[in-house]
Amino acid sequence: MKPTPEALLQRLKQHFPDAHITVQDDSHHHRGHAGAAGGAGHFAVTLVSPVFAGLSTVRRHRLVYDAVADWMPHRIHALSIRAEVPGN
């Protein structure tokens, strides 16, 4: 079963307490998709935090994936990530 957007937001806030975070549930765009059939969600997240300063895009995404690793792939099937520093 997929997490609610609010549950995903809270999980990300635990790992990135100083970040501005938005979560969008895109699961409805994927009806009939193999991952959606199992109940796992499709989400788009944006995080803006100074913690990402000096990090490559790959490293930024890895930090976000690490925060939800135990939810993938059974609760989250797809996660689109924008991880930026303030002022970008």
Where does each model-flagged region fall?
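A generic structural motif
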Residues: 51-53
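C-terminal structural segments of small proteins and small subunits
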Residues: 55-88
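A generic structural signal for short beta-strands and their flanking turns/coil linkers
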Residues: 17-19, 39-43, 75-79
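Solvent-exposed beta-strand sheet faces enriched in polar/charged residues
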Residues: 22-24, 46-48, 82-84
